[in-house]
Amino acid sequence: DGIVRGAYKIEELGDGSDKIRLLGSGPILRNVREAALELHRDYGISSEIWSVTSYGELRRKGLEHERSMRLNPEISEEPYVSRCFGDQIPTVATSDYISSVPEMIQRWIGGRYIVLGTDGFGRSDTREALRSFFEIDTNSIVVAAISALEQEGTLPPGTVEKELRNRNLNRERMDKTA
């Protein structure tokens, strides 16, 4: 049912109170799962891992629901996208499309929402190198999740800085969209 509706939960990793939701699709799901494993191993962070089959369908149904509610105010149920992502769990959406694709559902996300996408100029390289350049690789997903949790106060200040050093990532490098 979720496949057709636009998103479905693949798995939950861990059962702790510190939790992140990770969204991905297609080949990026491998990186999302790796990030979830690393977050659990290194920080004890639990993850919901979701496959998004269509941000467009989630948006269409969300907009359709909003229209229905305008015309029928007695409707009280939430749209599917809100039932999936409307709580306060911080969410990181990773896409090998431009970030405006996952941003289509931002209005229905309840908590902090970080989007990683391939904005910028076209390039030619290996898949691994391109994912690293566009910051949609496993390292970038882990850092985005840690950043969301640090901003929420779940992780102590300085956790992102430590993780950037551990992963040898340079925050001063050129912005991919520049």
Residue positions per predicted region:
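Thiamine diphosphate
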Residues: D1-A178
